[in-house]
């Protein structure tokens, strides 16, 4: 599996260390193991996880500006855990309302010695951080409108929303609230993944 991940990463411009590769593979192994009992993801095959979960997450690492990030509706830690492994100098809060997911993330953080992740069990509307985040990340929301509406209280003054999407939809943009606008759309190239992926960056209007 390690060799397969190295081959996938070689098809991108990402730079990874041996330790990062070991941690990413370790995460997939733990996810595969826990998934049998806890049903954390619909993806069952570890090789498929490498593409749909690891590569789909880590390609975003090149676009993160700032130090403090929150992954809302992280599920089993996606994209938060792979991003934290790729960006050890940044801090990631991983938010989910389901206890089994947060227990899994705590186990991952402990076993793989990931120092820059804070798992939080909470509904997003009830979570009140002491300070805002530079980036609010999610691939969990059905629409960007849902994302910015539920997470409006989370960005810092100059913070952004980072929505991981499949197709980029002008219809979704039209449905955004007036206080929010799309500042950038970045097509993401993910080796061996069928279908298009986009990172949509949204900002509150001043």
Swiss-Prot record:
Highest taxon in the source lineage: Bacteria
Keyword Transferase on entry: yes
Leading EC class: transferase
Entry keyword set: Cytoplasm, Methyltransferase, rRNA processing, S-adenosyl-L-methionine, Transferase
EC assignment: 2.1.1.170
GO molecular function: rRNA (guanine-N7-)-methyltransferase activity
Cellular localisation: Cytoplasm
Annotated S-adenosyl-L-methionine binding sites: 73, 78, 124-125, 139
GO cellular component assignments: cytosol
Reactions accelerated catalytically: guanosine(527) in 16S rRNA + S-adenosyl-L-methionine = N(7)-methylguanosine(527) in 16S rRNA + S-adenosyl-L-homocysteine
Function statement: Specifically methylates the N7 position of guanine in position 527 of 16S rRNA.
Family label: Belongs to the methyltransferase superfamily. RNA methyltransferase RsmG family.
Protein name, UniProt field: Ribosomal RNA small subunit methyltransferase G
The organism of origin for this protein: Photobacterium profundum (strain SS9)
Gene of this entry: rsmG
